[in-house]
């Protein structure tokens, strides 16, 4: 089973965990786009929907859903999103699509966070995928120098501007053995908007599609 089919399978499977008539938070990324398509096919109805990226908002609206601002509705009952990496402790690396700040805001506001992945995203140790750090543009060089002091290698993702109007540094070789402390440390650097370590607000449930066709919940 190829990766696209695995994404579609887990996106359909999570519908069993998402009741109608709730406030739903929707993340971003390729697996989430499959989830939006599954919502459309199932003709689900929700009280409100909030989205973590402009891309997801447009996909939801194209599927017939009305997207609300987080300030204009109740906190999400459930937030569904993917991950670039996730470990057994449900700590994630996110931000490959540059939507990490809005993803973390909605995840933090939500009562329950369900992460949907295919088996390629499950790792024994975090860090193979670089950690995205959203920065205010004028602070890029300063933040990069501070990150070097942490023993890591920041690289500017040139040409990418986030939905918030900021830039992204992709941080390689970051020591994530104490991911929660590293998340807090990076977020104390002046000019950092948010980082893509999701340790303080990790997933509550994970649904993973395997190449044998099974869906694993943990």
From Swiss-Prot:
Its EC number is 5.3.1.6. It is an enzyme of class 5 (isomerase). InterPro entries: NagB/RpiA_transferase-like, Ribose5P_isomerase_typA_subgr, Ribose5P_isomerase_type_A. It catalyses: aldehydo-D-ribose 5-phosphate = D-ribulose 5-phosphate. Pathway: Carbohydrate degradation; pentose phosphate pathway; D-ribose 5-phosphate from D-ribulose 5-phosphate (non-oxidative stage): step 1/1. SUPFAM superfamilies: D-ribose-5-phosphate isomerase (RpiA), lid domain (SSF75445), NagB/RpiA/CoA transferase-like (SSF100950). The active site is at 103 (proton acceptor). One of its GO terms (biological process) is D-ribose metabolic process. GO terms for cellular component: cytosol. GO terms for molecular function: ribose-5-phosphate isomerase activity. Catalyzes the reversible conversion of ribose-5-phosphate to ribulose 5-phosphate. Homodimer. Belongs to the ribose 5-phosphate isomerase family. This is Ribose-5-phosphate isomerase A. It comes from Dichelobacter nodosus (strain VCS1703A).
